[in-house]
């Protein structure tokens, strides 16, 4: 049975419906999931009329519950029934209420096990008073870790949506170690990496230059890295962000832990504007496109749907990887560890049916 994926429509006056519709008309999407859009049917129809002719004949399967979702159809649950005027490019009270109603309903269905993963289209933070990541952490089990993903490039954050003035107080040894632990666990369970290599970025220019430009590296970040190593986490650094990304050094790691939002997102988006925001650390799977509401291009048929499509596929990939990991760790097989060609440890499981062992008693 294909997993049911909840897709919240986001801000009704932004590009959410546009990127969702364009993404779902990629035929392969329906081969791996049953999508259910949480939004408003009337609003969806208005957005369709702003798109190319090929989208005009779309029909919706209007349902009341995810269990009614049909394979190969655009399933939609109407979550906000009040009069909902569409004012493209504007943040309004109606659009905020509609966005929150869709997210609340989708989260309720996710918690009830009616859907298997959540993909969220962009919202204006006024709708929630906070970001998606912080909202979800309060409603599901676990500690959140914001991670941006694009192929083998993964950038996680110590600090999410906080002002620059608040960052120094949040850069603590305990917090960095917690984020490193969450990141390491996610790379193993969600991405199938046996022994991930994690690069940790410095806070200050030139990694503090031995304390001349700040002491956070010596007093906080390096001790956190050392403690992570003691726990078996392959953490390295701290690295000055400019040289680390400018030299391409990031390609030698499975993930990067940045100290704050712009330190991580500026190089990430410079390298790829079609990445995905993944909320790691929680007991649910949630992804989203790595862009905002797009008020400036809403209704102009200019939105690039690739980030949304990548978010849909990443949700499926993580679901599969988690299932494989949980099955493997629930019934662990005996194994030996050998190094691969790059010197990384690799598990080789023992098959007792084909492998013969001689104990000391069998020897002459």
Residue spans for each PLM region:
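Conserved anion/nucleotide-ligand pocket segment
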Residues: 165-166, 170-173, 177
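Intrinsically disordered or low-complexity boundary/linker segments at protein termini
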Residues: 163-168, 293-296
């Amino acid at each position: 049975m294909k997993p049911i994926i909840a897709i919240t429509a986001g801000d009704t006056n932004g590009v959410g419906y546009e990127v969702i519709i364009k993404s779902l008309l990629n035929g392969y999407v329906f081969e791996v999931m049953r999508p259910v859009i949480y939004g408003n049917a009337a609003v969806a129809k208005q957005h369709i009329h702003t798109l190319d002719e090929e989208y005009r004949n779309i029909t919706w399967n209007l349902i009341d519950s995810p269990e009614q979702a049909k394979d190969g159809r655009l399933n939609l649950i109407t979550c906000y029934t009040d009069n909902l005027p569409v004012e493209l490019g504007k943040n309004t009270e109606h659009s905020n209420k509609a966005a929150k109603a869709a997210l609340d309903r989708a989260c309720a269905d996710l918690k009830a096990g009616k859907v298997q993963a959540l993909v969220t289209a962009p919202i204006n933070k006024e709708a929630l008073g906070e970001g998606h990541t912080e909202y979800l952490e309060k409603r599901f089990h676990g500690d959140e870790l914001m991670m941006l993903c694009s192929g083998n490039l993964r950038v996680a954050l110590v600090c999410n949506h906080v002002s620059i003035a608040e960052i120094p107080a949040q850069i603590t040894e305990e917090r960095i170690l917690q984020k490193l632990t969450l990141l390491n666990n996610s790379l193993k369970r969600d991405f199938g990496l046996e022994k991930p290599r994690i690069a940790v970025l410095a806070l200050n220019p030139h990694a503090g230059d031995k304390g001349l430009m700040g002491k956070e590296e010596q007093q906080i970040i390096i001790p956190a890295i050392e403690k992570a190593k003691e726990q078996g986490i392959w953490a390295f650094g701290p690295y000055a962000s400019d040289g680390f990304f400018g030299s391409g050094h990031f390609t030698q790691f499975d993930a990067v832990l940045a100290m704050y939002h712009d330190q991580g997102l500026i190089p990430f988006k410079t390298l790829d504007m079609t990445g995905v925001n993944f909320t790691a650390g929680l007991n649910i799977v949630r992804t989203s496109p790595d862009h905002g509401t797009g008020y400036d291009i809403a209704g102009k048929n200019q939105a690039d749907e690739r980030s949304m499509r990548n978010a849909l596929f990443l949700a499926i990939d993580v679901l599969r990887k988690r299932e494989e990991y949980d099955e493997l760790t629930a019934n662990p097989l005996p194994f030996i560890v050998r190094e691969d060609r790059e010197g990384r440890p690799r598990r080789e499981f023992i098959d007792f049916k084909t492998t013969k062992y001689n104990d000391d008693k069998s020897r002459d």
